[in-house]
Regions:
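C-terminal target-recognition/interaction regions appended to catalytic cores
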Residues: 1-124
Length: 124
């Protein structure tokens, strides 16, 4: 339900009580809701799958409606080809895999530049 998503994604400052009776102020800033399509994506976490609302799951607006990202989109955000995790496992397991994956394309590109600079330095 939309109100659950809005609460979880919204900023909050609430008085809470720990099990031992200690009272404290819990606060967290807002998370973009829905996620902006014109900005870099937030990190995909292992909890991306499943049905329930969550502060960390990605939600986008398309044609005036809110929707979650599908596994192929999660694959692509992690720089894997579309369908990379489509091995017959459930969508929830596919989302978990992408939340547990490392984005290797960017570090690889950085490494190529570093290696090229090292080669130039050695030849000087």
């Amino acid at each position: 339900n939309l109100s659950s998503w809005e609460y979880l994604k919204g900023g909050k400052k609430e008085q809470r009580t720990a099990r031992n009776g200690y009272e404290y102020t819990y606060s967290e800033g807002p998370v973009a809701f829905p996620d902006a399509l014109d900005k870099p994506s937030r990190t995909i976490l292992t909890g991306e799958g499943g049905r329930g609302a969550s502060r960390t799951k990605h939600v986008v607006e398309q044609n005036g409606r809110l929707r979650r990202l599908v596994p192929d989109e999660l694959d692509q955000l992690q720089m894997f080809p579309r369908g990379w995790t489509d091995t017959g496992m459930t969508d929830g397991h596919r989302a978990f895999c992408m939340g547990n994956a490392l984005v290797t394309g960017i570090p690889h590109r950085i490494g190529v530049v570093i290696a090229a600079d090292a080669d130039v330095s050695r030849s000087e």
